[in-house]
Amino acid sequence: KNKDDDALPQLNVLFLVDQKSGLPIFYRFYDGNVPDVSTIRHTIADQALLNMKNVVLVAGKGYNSVKNINDCLINKVEFIFNVRLGTKGCLARELIDEHRKEFADLNSGDPYIRKNSATAKVNWKYDPRPVDGKPASNSATAELYCHMFYDPVIYQEAADKLTESLLTIKKKLLENEALTEQEEELKEKFFRNDKEKGLIIINRRVDDYLKYKGFRVLVTDSEKDPVKAWTAYADRWRVEDAFATLKDRLGCNRIRCSDNKALQGKTFVQFIATGLSLMVRSRIRCYMKENKKAGKLNLVYESDAKILQVLNNVMQTRFNHGYYFDEVAGKKI
C-alpha cells in the first residue's frame, strides 16, 4: 500500500518553487520505488538542463545519505538535508551530545521559530571524481554546517505518551489482562521482573529512548544562519502538507481519477494551488522582516491555518471611490 493507504504503487511528485516569492517553477512525477540517490541525481540534471541558478535542494530524512551529499558537493549544488537520528553512534547524535548544555540555556531559543538552536561546523571529506568499483579518494574537503534544534514541547509530548503507555501496561499486567501486540513489544523493551520489587520499569531504557526526542539536525553547505535553514526546511514541509491537504480537498486522489491524463491534470492544479499557498506565506514573511515597529501585527512562524485565522478578523469597508480597513481585533500570536 502507498501513503494514502490505497492498494496502488506509490507515486511521488517533486516540486521546485521560489522560496522568496513562493512562485512555482517546476514539478515532475516519478515512481515511489526510485532510489533516493537516483532522484537527487536526476534533479541536479533537471536544474542544469533548465539553466536554473541559485538552486538549493531541501529534502527530508530519506535523502540525507553520504552519496547524496557528495553528489551535491561535486556538482556545486547547495543543499539543506534533514538528518536521521535513529542510528547509534551517528555524527548527528555526537554533535547533540556535545552541545546539550547550550540547549538548556534559554538564551539559545529563537522567538521566531520558537526552538533552541546550536550550530557546529564539520570538515567533510569526499571524492571529487568517484569511479565505480574503486575506493573513494576523499581528497576534497568542504565545510558543512550542522544546525541543531530542540523543541521541549515535542520532547514532553513523547515522554507523556510513553509514560501513559507504560503505566497502562503495568496496570494490565498486575490485573492479569491481555496485552496488545504493540504493548507486548513495549513490555519486552521497558520492563523486567525484580526479585524484591516484582515488575518494574527500566528507567535507563526510558531515558535512552527519550534522549534525542525533540531534536532535529539540518546539514547544509551554504546556510550559516540556523533560523534561515529552519525556515527553508519548514517551507518544504509546508509545501508537502499543503499538497496533501489539497489532494484531499480537490479530489485528486488516484482512486478519483479516471485515467492517467486526469491524474496529471489534477496534479497540475495542485501544483498551482500549492504555489499560491506558499506565496501567501512568503508575503507574510516579508511583512515580518520589514515591519518590526511596536504596534504592528506580531506573527510567529505558525501554520497557514493559524495565520489565516488571525488575518480572518481583518475587515474591509468599500465605497464607490475607495475603501478602508476596520480595526484589527483578535488575539495576536
Located regions from the model:
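Anion-binding and metal-coordination hotspots
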Residues: K1-I333
